[in-house]
């Protein structure tokens, strides 16, 4: 298992980037906010790393549950909130390259990334400004898995902000 860090910032805007660091604190990638036609404004991020460009964002037109558009070097894949579990915790699933992907919050509020039932990565959000990523050594060499894992941290942040807002609104009415 290899360890990486996402060094987040308070407010990420189009001109500012977040770095992804390896165990020796070397920059292995950068993440920026971006816009992609067909995605909700403010919900799309791009990961760049030596010849790899991946974007992940929330598709326009959702009511309650999100559909995620993941693009990597010209290919596009769709992931969706798991309608049963997403009401209770962050849970995204989909099929990429004929493999079933599950990205799911565990009891420790960490995100487990599984491919065909095998856990390949763990996102450990810190309370503030970043996350630690633990990724299977072999899996870390696959641009699709590595970039999607890094970008999913930002979808988790959006999910948490939105659920906090919904909880606040519900408290007003109860």
Language model features with spans:
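Low-complexity or membrane-interfacial segments used for flexible interactions
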Residues: 1-42, 51, 76, 88-174
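Short, well-structured hydrophobic secondary-structure segments
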Residues: 38-72
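Periodic aromatic/glycine/histidine/acidic cluster detector
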Residues: 29-32, 55-58, 79-81
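Helix-adjacent hinge/juxtasegments
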Residues: 62-92
């Amino acid at each position: 298992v290899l360890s990486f860090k996402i060094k987040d910032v308070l407010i990420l805007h189009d001109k500012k980037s977040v770095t992804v660091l390896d165990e020796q604190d070397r920059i292995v990638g950068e993440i920026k906010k971006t816009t992609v036609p067909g995605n909700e404004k403010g919900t799309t991020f791009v990961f760049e790393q030596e010849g790899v460009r991946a974007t992940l964002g929330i598709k326009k037109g959702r009511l309650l549950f999100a559909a995620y558009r993941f693009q990597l070097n010209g290919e596009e894949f769709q992931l969706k909130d798991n309608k049963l579990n997403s009401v209770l915790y962050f849970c995204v699933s989909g099929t990429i390259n004929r493999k079933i992907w599950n990205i799911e919050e565990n009891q420790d509020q960490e995100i487990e990334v599984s491919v065909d039932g095998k856990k390949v990565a763990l996102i450990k959000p810190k309370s503030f400004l970043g996350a630690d990523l633990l990724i299977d050594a072999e899996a870390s060499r696959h641009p699709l898995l590595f970039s999607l894992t890094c970008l999913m941290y930002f979808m988790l942040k959006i999910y948490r902000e939105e659920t906090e807002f919904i909880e606040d609104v519900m408290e007003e009415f109860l």
